[in-house]
A protein has these predicted regions:
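Selective recognition of specific alpha-helical transmembrane segments in multi-pass small-molecule
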Residues: 26-33, 60-67, 72, 188-202, ...
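TM-loop-TM module centered on a large, flexible mid-protein loop between adjacent transmembrane helices
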Residues: 87-96, 103, 135-143, 220, ...
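Extracellular loop-to-transmembrane helix junctions
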Residues: 31-150, 154-158, 366, 599-611
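Transmembrane alpha-helical segments of multi-pass small-molecule transport proteins
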Residues: 55-61, 107, 137-174, 189-195, ...
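Hydrophobic alpha-helical segments and their helix-loop junctions in multi-pass secondary transporters
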Residues: 131-134, 186-236, 246, 254, ...
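Membrane-helix boundary/coupling elements in multi-pass transport proteins
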Residues: 81-85, 113-131, 331, 336-348, ...
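A generic transmembrane alpha-helix motif of multi-pass inner-membrane proteins
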Residues: 30, 38, 56, 188-191, ...
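Membrane-interface "cap" regions at the ends of multi-pass membrane proteins
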Residues: 1-52, 65-66, 70, 101, ...
Length: 634
């Protein structure tokens, strides 16, 4: 392992035990935050059917991550020092009599691929937190901020402030970071359990035909609401479009027009009687819930099927379709990554050889296998005819909507339900601070490791004299995260199946960055693009790590056929399959857009080409051999 450039350079202090290491990894996974922040993305991509396999897709993604986690854990036993898989690759190849010649190449490829993940992921987190902030603005100032469109100006400003604010926490050092992460984990997991229990209780208490709640312009009510035809800017009624963007026809061959709930002068939903006519609340027809199969799956006039909700609990955990599972698994990778982050904290660990392997697996099992599977079951089971999956895909925060519904039912009023949602939103915001902090800190430490090794500019390999944090890498990553966060929010509503409602707020907060309602059916979803870029970096890193694990234990006295061959081979093939699926899936799976995955793949390809050019030029300028002819002196 390379030494610091100067013997007087400060080094990190070992302060973390098993609990501290596990907490830091758990902060990056953040199950309470990701349920809120990715449910819309998972509901929308692959619509109108792929959302039915959300829970099983997470199971498959979890198996992929567990295979990779085992590889990380085993490697950390051999090489407990700092640097994550970047140094694992070097040490694994250098330990072999023939493969040692590829040590520097393998090390650089691993580190460069990890940057596609570790540099993009924080930007994605900054962006989704800005979306959360935009959603909450409507809750506090509904007359100023739209319930459909988050303010572009606000989100841009938020991305800048949030990115540098979190970077400052990371700059202060790992000890403060661990304390913050522990507090945030306790709060968000408690909030997660509360919501999940309430969600399951709501579904079990509201049987077929019972009176339930739905949202009308964001307000939870249990009665029918008067509707009128939605019109465009010229006053013409807007038709309901099918999956092929063609007007839907009724049984008589006439167009079906979009309808919207109406409100009174105070912004309250206008009640409707059994005939759909406006009336008073005491005469309003009750809103009844349905879970029947014919309601769970609906067809338009062209025969296109849309999944709305799960008719039974068994349906929630079912795979439904191989293609749908792949779509959901490839997106779900975003919510599971982070377990490997503790391997970059080898220098901060008190007993790295013993504690890091345990922390890698523990963090994934606790949050992935327990928290995620429970909360995603609860959220999917809660869906019904009052709030279906298409509603979730068109919402800026579907989990926030569901919290309003369940809170209104449990506490007896919309005001109480809204307050319940705001409390939960606060815990999500805290979790996002912890998540962004953890991934930014991890990314900075990987860059620090490469900078200390002079594979990237050496100033990245310096530690701050007082805080002992890789300050150059942290502030650089903060700038990148702010930029990528802005890209994430620029068209986060793109890829809609149907046109959105027209913008109803016209002020400085919406002076730019808003497209026509129809444009959102054609524009790519930038949130999904950034997610997939990060995920492709993850797939490359995890594939490489599995290969490194195979190489490291080949002909080693600790070799175990299952842990060191079967498991990493499975992880390698599973990650590769996810990458390849995005090449072929858009051409064969209805509802899977070709735009987002191919843009993301293009970015990944450009990053790889640039990395190779940089590596070759750097090797020539420094006189380093790309292919080693002899093992370096220890």
């Amino acid at each position: 392992m390379p030494e610091p450039s100067s013997s007087s350079s400060p080094t990190m202090k070992p302060t973390l035990g098993l609990t501290g290491l596990t907490i830091n990894a758990m902060a990056l996974i953040a199950p309470g935050a990701f349920l809120w922040l990715t449910f819309q993305e998972q509901s929308l991509y692959g619509a109108p059917l792929a959302g039915c396999a959300m829970w099983f897709g997470i199971v498959c993604a979890l198996l992929l991550c567990l295979a990779t986690a085992v590889s990380y854990a085993e490697l950390s036993k051999l090489y407990p020092g700092a640097g994550s898989s970047y140094f694992y690759a070097e040490q694994a190849f250098l330990s072999k009599t023939k493969a040692f010649k590829f040590a520097r190449l393998a090390k650089f490829f691993t580190g460069w691929a990890s940057h596609l993940y570790y540099w993009v992921y924080p930007g994605c987190m900054v962006g989704v937190t800005a979306i959360l902030g935009g959603y909450l603005l409507n809750q506090f100032w509904p007359d100023t901020f739209s319930s459909t469109y988050d303010s572009p100006l606000f989100m841009i400003l938020f991305c800048i402030v949030f990115s540098y604010g979190v970077a400052y926490i990371a700059f202060r050092g790992v000890t403060g970071t661990t304390a913050v992460n522990m507090a945030i984990n306790i709060i968000q997991i408690a909030a997660l359990v509360v919501f999940s229990i309430i969600a399951i209780a709501y579904r079990t208490k509201h049987t077929e035909g019972s009176v339930g709640y739905h949202l009308s312009n964001g307000v939870a009510v249990n009665y029918q609401v008067f509707q009128d035809t939605v019109k465009d800017d010229k006053g013409a009624p807007l038709p309901v479009l099918d999956a092929n963007s063609k007007p839907t026809m009724d049984s008589a061959g006439k167009p079906v027009y979009q309808m919207a709930d109406q409100t009174d002068k105070d912004g309250n939903p206008v009640p409707a009687d059994a005939n759909g006519k406006s009336t008073t609340v005491d005469k309003a027809a009750p809103f009844t819930l349905s879970y029947t199969v014919d309601q769970a799956y609906s067809k338009d006039s062209s025969g296109n099927v849309t999944f709305n909700f799960h008719p039974t609990a068994k349906s929630v955990i079912g795979p439904h379709s191989f293609n749908f599972v792949f779509i959901q698994a490839c997106v779900a990778i975003l919510i599971l990554v982070g377990f490997e982050s503790v391997t970059s904290m080898g220098e901060e660990a008190k007993n790295p050889k013993k504690d890091i392997p345990k922390a890698v697996v523990l963090s994934l099992v606790i949050q992935g296998a327990i928290c995620y599977l429970f909360e995603y079951f609860a959220a999917n089971y809660l869906l019904n005819s009052g709030y279906a999956l298409p509603n979730a895909g068109a919402s800026g925060s579907p989990i926030g909507d569901l919290m309003v519904i369940t809170g209104t039912w449990l506490f007896g009023s919309y005001a109480a339900g809204r307050a319940f949602m705001l409390v939960q939103a606060f815990t999500v915001f805290l979790a996002m601070i912890g998540t962004t902090l953890a991934c930014l800190s991890t990314g900075a430490r990987v860059t620090y490791a490469m900078g200390r090794d002079d594979e990237v500019p050496s100033h990245f390999g310096l530690l701050h004299g007082r805080t002992l944090s890789p300050h150059r890498a942290i502030w650089t990553l903060a700038t990148i995260s702010a930029i990528l966060g802005i890209v994430t929010v620029s068209c986060y509503l793109g890829g809609q199946s149907n046109p959105l409602a027209a913008l109803d707020k016209h002020n400085i907060w919406y002076s730019f960055g808003i497209f026509s309602p129809e444009a959102y059916t054609k524009l790519p979803n930038t949130l999904l693009i950034i997610t997939l870029i990060s995920n492709f970096g993850t797939f490359l890193l995890y594939m490489t790590t599995c290969i490194v694990a195979i190489v490291a234990f080949r002909e080693h006295h600790m070799f175990n056929g299952f842990k060191h061959l079967v498991v990493p081979v499975f992880g390698l093939l599973a990650n590769l399959a996810c990458m390849l699926f995005y090449l072929v899936g858009p051409w064969s799976v209805p509802g899977m857009s070709v735009k987002e995955p191919y843009i993301a793949l293009g970015v990944a390809a450009v990053w790889g080409i640039y990395g190779w050019v940089y590596f070759v030029k750097k090797s020539k300028s420094t006189g380093k051999a790309v292919i080693l002819t002899a093992k370096p002196a220890v």
